[in-house]
Amino acid sequence: MDISKMDRYAAPVHFSSLPLLATVLCGVGLLLLAAFTMLQVTSTKYNRNVFKELFIAATSSIFLGFGSVFLLLWVGIYV
């Protein structure tokens, strides 16, 4: 296996778009986290909807997770 004949690896996301992706994904995740917190504080135990809570929490978790990955890539920690 000759390394010089292999194709060079190209990242699926261009490095110049990492700051925008990190900022947008973390921002959306934090907004959903705030919405989830407001939902928990303002609802009583009689009008809570567990599916709505799980949907908002899972969506926020996904956005914050991907935002954290892009943030780490942006600062040079290649995970």
UniProtKB/Swiss-Prot annotation:
UniProt keyword list: Membrane, Transmembrane, Transmembrane helix
Biological or metabolic pathway of the protein: Protein modification; protein glycosylation
Pfam families with a match to the protein in the record: Ost5
InterPro entries reported in the protein's UniProt record: TMEM258/Ost5 (IPR007915)
Annotated membrane topology: Multi-pass membrane protein
Transmembrane regions listed in the UniProt entry: 18-38, 55-75
Protein name in UniProt: Dolichyl-diphosphooligosaccharide--protein glycosyltransferase subunit TMEM258
Highest classification ranks of the organism: Eukaryota, Metazoa, Ecdysozoa, Nematoda, Chromadorea
Gene name tied to this protein: tmem-258
